[in-house]
Amino acid sequence: MTRIDDKFAQLAKDGKKAFVAYVMAGDPNYETSLEVVKGLPAAGVDVIELGLPFTDPMADGPTIQLAGQRALEAGMTLQKTLDLARAFRKDDQTTPIVMMGYYNPIYSRGVDRFLAEAKDAGIDGLIVVDLPPEEDSELCLPAQAAGLNFIRLATPTTDDKRLPRVLQNTSGFVYYVSITGITGAAEAQAVDVGPEVARIKSAAALPVIVGFGVNTPEKSKAIAEVADGVVVGSAIVGKIGAGQSVSDVLAFVKTLADGAHSV
């Protein structure tokens, strides 16, 4: 059992939905980013998604692309992302952290080395958006052997023929991308999401968390009503990008978390 498994088991026992927050590691700089991440649990965040900055983030919309650029320009690296997670773990041993990013930085570091370091830093799971299930032997299977969850994305275009392949080695939870396209580009609609969540849950005994296009407390509540939880990324990252104070960012996060938890 990972921290992710424990968290979702506890939420299910309590009859609660999960609120997951995405932030880019090192945006706008290491110190501010760490302060934000440290404040997320008290703002109601159940699982933290920590973005790994990358030079070619093909699945990300402009808001998160800019966050990655800011982080890279401030000197953020894979090593510093691991350092940030380790610093967070000094004060918090229970909140799960999922590292989300692309395969190239991991491959460049060496898979075995990366997995050992990630585990040691307190990372609990990985989302690697550019590794399809056909490449499970590259990272997915070694990650799970190392005790990390490997979380897959399902989309509206993942048909019934493809879905079992996507879910085959998925663990922790399934991240349902509620819209086609890049992050932050459109809004999720609960009426569309509900049947898709049911379809995925019928194929895998895992929580289904919905992201992409959730940007208000009302939307967070609406999506949480038809899923096991909700992910918000671009809306939070946009506040950081606008130069809002850490306290203002966390206050906004709390409104989103309260929306999801009000179900």
From Swiss-Prot:
Instruction: Provide the alphabetized UniProt keywords.
Output: Amino-acid biosynthesis, Aromatic amino acid biosynthesis, Lyase, Tryptophan biosynthesis
Q: Which GO molecular function annotations are given, in alphabetical order?
A: tryptophan synthase activity
Which catalytic residues are annotated? 49, 60
Which Gene3D superfamilies does UniProt cross-reference here?
Aldolase class I
Q: Which InterPro entries match?
A: Aldolase_TIM, RibuloseP-bd_barrel, Trp_synthase_alpha_AS, Trp_synthase_suA
Q: Which reaction does it catalyse?
A: (1S,2R)-1-C-(indol-3-yl)glycerol 3-phosphate + L-serine = D-glyceraldehyde 3-phosphate + L-tryptophan + H2O
The record ties this protein, via PROSITE patterns, to:
TRP_SYNTHASE_ALPHA (PS00167)
Gene Ontology cellular component list: cytosol
Give the EC number(s) listed in the UniProt record.
Answer: 4.2.1.20
Q: What does this protein do?
A: The alpha subunit is responsible for the aldol cleavage of indoleglycerol phosphate to indole and glyceraldehyde 3-phosphate.
Q: How does it assemble?
A: Tetramer of two alpha and two beta chains.
Q: Which family does it belong to?
A: Belongs to the TrpA family.
Spell out the protein name for this chain. Tryptophan synthase alpha chain
Q: Which organism is it from?
A: Roseobacter denitrificans (strain ATCC 33942 / OCh 114) (Erythrobacter sp. (strain OCh 114))
